[in-house]
Amino acid sequence: YLEDIPAVYEFGEYKTLSIPGAYSIDKQLRIQNNWGWFENEQLSDSEMEIGRNLIEKYPIMDLVISHTCPITFEPRDLFLKSFDQSKVDKRMEIYLGEIEAKLDYKRWAWGHFHADRLYPWDGDKEKLMLFDENVVDLNKFMTMKRTDSLFDIIA
């Protein structure tokens, strides 16, 4: 069971920071149609503070798993043209950018944007965006080489 707040876990030998939460751009549509929606979908200020305290206590992580990504990683090419981006609440992405700037990590994985993508390497760091079709082998992801592709790390 994963906590619904920032938390640190050990997955095998990998120290992992988990950070839930993201803004739903289709929130109004969900409300109008009585579809499921989580009012507390984003972290509160106090929950964000928990994450800040965790990276002070554990400044080095092997892996970060988050629902959305730091603001600088956003896949702008995947933004839905029908939604006015100026109305999208970016607090989570800005917060994750703050975490990313202060944390020493090897790998970062997230979903939210409904696509699969490996990002270009940044020093020894690799970033992975996944949707729901693929399952990544954690050991392959954590030990991948610059020449590996997304297909090389699929379970």
For each predicted feature, which ranges?
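Metallo-beta-lactamase
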Residues: 1-12
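Residues that form or immediately flank small-molecule/cofactor binding pockets and catalytic motifs
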Residues: 5-7, 21, 133-135
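Short amphipathic alpha-helical segments and helix-helix/interface helices
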Residues: 6, 51-55, 92-100
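Binuclear metal-dependent phosphoesterase catalytic core
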Residues: 10, 87, 97-102, 114-155
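Active-site-proximal loop/helix segment associated with metal-binding centers of metalloenzymes
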Residues: 11-90
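Hydrophobic/aromatic beta-strand patches that form the interior of the parallel beta-sheet core
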Residues: 17, 107-109, 129
